[in-house]
């Protein structure tokens, strides 16, 4: 670690040896990944649309084809 002084702001600069991939530590993504691997199934997310959109985007980038994921589309007004 090294201390860097930028005018009046002083911060510590850290050097990391690795990176954390959120896709590898996210349990819902793991469950959806397992469901996509079973023929004739569609993953269902009982949550917000944003969570499903992120997973769709990640899967589309990985598989390079559209992936269907169903969602309940919950939002704060439904509570």
UniProtKB/Swiss-Prot annotation:
EC id: 1.18.6.1
Alphabetized Gene3D superfamilies for the sequence: Nitrogenase molybdenum iron protein domain
Translocase recorded as keyword: no
Keyword annotations: ATP-binding, Iron, Iron-sulfur, Metal-binding, Nitrogen fixation, Nucleotide-binding, Oxidoreductase
SUPFAM superfamilies, sorted: Helical backbone' metal receptor
Signal peptide positions on this chain: none
Ribosomal protein is among the record's keywords: no
InterPro entries in UniProt: ChlB/BchB/BchZ (IPR050152), Nase/OxRdtase_comp1 (IPR000510)
Name of protein: Nitrogenase molybdenum-iron protein beta chain
């Amino acid at each position: 670690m090294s201390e860097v002084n930028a005018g009046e702001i002083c911060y510590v600069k850290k050097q990391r040896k690795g990176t954390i991939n959120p896709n590898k530590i996210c349990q819902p993504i793991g469950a959806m990944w397992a469901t996509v691997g079973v023929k004739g199934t569609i993953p269902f997310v009982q949550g917000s649309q944003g969570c499903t959109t992120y997973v769709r985007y990640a899967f589309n980038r990985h598989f390079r084809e559209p992936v269907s994921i169903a969602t309940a589309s919950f939002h704060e007004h439904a509570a």
